[in-house]
Amino acid sequence: MPRFRLIVEYDGTDYVGWQRQDNGPSVQGAIEKAVLSLTGETVRVRGAGRTDSGVHARGQVAHLDLTRAWKPYTLQNALNAHLSLAGERVSILEVEEAAADFDARFSAIRRHYLYRIISRRSPLALEARRAWWVPKALDHDAMHEAAQRLLGHHDFTTFRSANCQATSPMRTLDRLDVTRTGDLIEIRASAQSFLHNQIRSFAGSLKLVGESKWTPDNLQAALEARDRKACGPVAPPDGLYFMRVDY
């Protein structure tokens, strides 16, 4: 039974998240329906990351097994045709055959995310639901300086959801950079894996630094507190993008 690796882009606005759930449409469910419509097979599509409702992806990776040995290009085009016909905001950017032991989630060695903030007085029109609108000036240099305090291997209890199902709060953060181009502030994060709401918690806390409500020392103290109550407000999902997975 051949295994295929997919690179997937989606607008997460109208989905309950990547993972199939009973309370609304999911990205996983949309792809599985497209596969069923195309092949008649009921399959499980497994993703590298279970993004939440409203979170977008430019490079989610998934895998699935089919009984037929499809040509990757043909499978990609056919799935996109079925997704488009169903009105889904999901696009298959690439399909390739994968080794039988490849697992989109467990074979990953690093995941890369982007969080976008637009810092300006005027409300968002074209970027609505694509970024976090912050109608005030933010000091991105201070945000970047503070972000460097979080790099390395730490107990990130402060920055994970109370509902996080991970068995350990320990993670190694490889990258957390803050840059600015015009009104756009970008926070880029890389690690082998992240805790639930970890990046949105980073973004919300870094915003406090950008507003001069927190200093970099305050952010480090929040990390060292190992207490969810020490976290700043969790940033909305609109600005978060799953960008890429390394294997």
From Swiss-Prot:
It catalyses: uridine(38/39/40) in tRNA = pseudouridine(38/39/40) in tRNA. GO terms for biological process: tRNA pseudouridine synthesis. CDD domains: PseudoU_synth_EcTruA. SUPFAM superfamilies: Pseudouridine synthase. Signal peptide: none annotated. Belongs to the tRNA pseudouridine synthase TruA family. This is tRNA pseudouridine synthase A. It comes from Sinorhizobium medicae (strain WSM419). The lineage of its organism: Bacteria, Pseudomonadati, Pseudomonadota, Alphaproteobacteria, Hyphomicrobiales.
